[in-house]
Curated annotation (Swiss-Prot):
Its main location: secreted. The keyword Lipid metabolism does not apply. Glycans are attached at residue 342. It comes from the Eukaryota. Its cofactor is FAD. This is Prenylcysteine oxidase 1-like. SUPFAM superfamilies: FAD/NAD(P)-binding domain (SSF51905). One of its GO terms (cellular component) is membrane. One of its GO terms (molecular function) is prenylcysteine oxidase activity. GO terms for biological process: neutrophil-mediated killing of bacterium; prenylated protein catabolic process; prenylcysteine catabolic process. Gene3D superfamilies: FAD/NAD(P)-binding domain, Protoporphyrinogen oxidase, mitochondrial, domain 2. The gene is PCYOX1L.
Length: 494
């Protein structure tokens, strides 16, 4: 009975707020998940509703989610998302807002390995790299660049729409507003099919495009074209990271928001209503035991899918019931290996002559996707990248944990191996339809957008959309939701 008392008090307070009228801001908001999506949506919700709204962020693990680091030999290295595209405008804004800095870039050459030899090798000379691309693949690389730039030019419209307060209740509506039926169709056709239509050769797709997609998604050119285009855009632009670790963005946003971080596993969301106003009871469990609280708005900022064994979140009291999100996720294993590279495996018996810091792979060898000589999250002015003959920290990305024999294939010897296993991205093609952000009146699924494309910036875009959607719904500003022909509307407003 003692435990029920604070719940009854909270419910009474929320009912009083609900009775105060439509102009009153929400009293309490719950966010489930403290990754980049959850921390960003907490920031955006406070930005729109004001500082008086209480925001509780539930996190069962570590703040940062798929932005994480691992300590190796007294240095910290990225084990999750390692870098961001220069056009990641929300992430750029977060870094400026929080007073963080870009990490100093340490240049290294890249190559694509095909199992027996290198398919493509980067040099230190830009014009020579272009000549090699032309010599091997004709103008396919130019056609690819034009295709990606066209997609990105349309996608960048989302920032203008969001700046004017527009939001979308479903992923399909958002995509249609940016690229009309073209973007929606790109979620149903493969990268390979789309590139062949614009004149990119099959050889270029097999040798280069597939390697980039394996590096970013762990998937092939059979994945949907829209997600593939977003991945290929990241490969073409300049990349950056956060000094001290990318996860500082998440912790910084939560601190700035003064969100109440509750370390617990959310088990259910139950609908209650009074006088036509929805209230949501969030039940959770932690080391202390089981408890629950009531909220005006709930945002789910963690993946919901049937094969996610770590998520047992259920929904009760909804009519019609909220369906499980269909589809599977692509497992990715990141292994940080402190050791000596076996350069002979890559055709360089003398390790001193091995010139590459980043190795991408085609479909073969299948046991790893990328191999990178990585730098710590804190880089001093005197820092230099380890030479191939020296013991270095290598990041190996693979679809499964590496066996000892596979580690021995890649490394002559090693001091330590530390791993992080992620349900990193949706397994594209495993879901027949695109999910919706709005699950109920004020219940939202932020991660819906990653079924169109998955990246840190995409999650930030989804966070802004959900915050605007919640705000516009709360104040019944329906003219700002799911509007068509937004380019014309925005130009008119300007």
């Amino acid at each position: 009975m003692a435990r029920a008392a604070p719940l009854l008090a909270a419910l009474t307070a929320l009912l009083a707020a609900a009775a105060a009228g439509g102009d009153a801001p929400p009293g309490k908001i719950a966010v489930v998940g403290a990754g980049i999506g959850g921390s960003a949506v907490a920031h955006f919700l406070q930005q729109h509703f004001g500082p008086r709204v209480q925001i509780d962020v539930y996190e069962k693990g570590t703040v940062g989610g798929r932005l994480a680091t691992i300590s190796v030999n007294k240095q910290h290295y990225e084990s999750g998302a390692a870098s961001f595209h220069s056009l990641s405008l929300h992430m750029q804004d977060f870094v400026k807002l929080l007073g963080l800095r870009h990490r100093r870039e340490v240049v290294g050459r890249s190559a694509i390995f095909g199992g027996e030899h290198f398919m493509l090798e980067e040099t230190d000379w830009y014009l020579l790299n272009l000549f090699r691309l032309w010599w091997h693949y004709g103008i396919s690389f130019l056609r690819l660049q034009m295709w990606v730039e066209e997609v990105m030019e349309k996608f960048m419209r989302i920032y203008k729409y969001q700046a004017h307060g527009y939001a979308f209740s479903g992923v399909e509506e958002l995509l249609y507003s940016l690229g009309e039926s073209t973007f929606v169709n790109m979620t149903q056709h493969s990268v390979a099919e789309s590139l062949l239509q614009v004149g990119v050769t099959q050889r270029f797709i097999d040798d280069v495009v597939s390697a980039v997609l394996r590096a970013s998604y762990g998937q092939s050119a059979a994945m949907p074209a829209f997600a593939g285009a977003m991945s290929l855009a990241g490969a073409q632009g300049s990349l950056w990271s956060v000094e001290g670790g990318n996860k500082l963005v998440c912790s910084g946003l939560l601190k700035l928001t003064k969100a109440n971080v509750i370390h617990a596993t959310v088990t259910s969301v139950t609908l209650h209503s009074t006088e036509g106003k929805a209230l949501y009871q969030v039940a959770y469990e932690n080391e202390v035991g089981n408890s629950s609280d009531f909220y005006d708005i709930v945002v789910i900022a963690t993946p919901l899918h049937l094969d996610n064994s770590s998520s047992n979140l259920t929904f009760a009291g909804f009519h019609p019931p909220i369906d499980d999100v269909q589809g599977s996720f692509q497992p990715t294993v990141v292994s940080l290996v402190h050791g000596y590279l076996n350069s002979s495996y890559f055709g360089f018996p003398d390790p001193k002559l091995f010139p590459f810091a980043n190795i991408l792979t085609t479909d073969f060898p299948s046991f790893f996707c990328t191999l990178d000589n990585i730098c710590p999250v804190n880089i001093s002015a005197s820092f230099r990248r380890k030479q191939p003959q020296e013991a270095a920290v290598w990041r190996v990305q693979s679809p499964k944990p590496l066996f000892r024999t596979q580690l021995k294939t890649l490394f002559r010897s090693y001091y330590s191996v530390q791993t992080a296993e992620w349900q990193a991205h949706p397994l594209y093609g495993s879901r027949p339809t695109l999910p919706r952000f709005a699950l109920h009146d004020q219940l939202f699924y932020l991660n819906a957008l990653e079924w169109a494309a998955s990246s840190v910036e995409v999650m930030a875009v989804a966070a802004k959309n959900v915050a605007l959607l919640a705000y516009n719904r709360w104040y019944q500003d329906l003219d700002k939701i799911d509007q068509k022909d937004l380019m014309h509307k925005v130009k008119t407003e300007l």
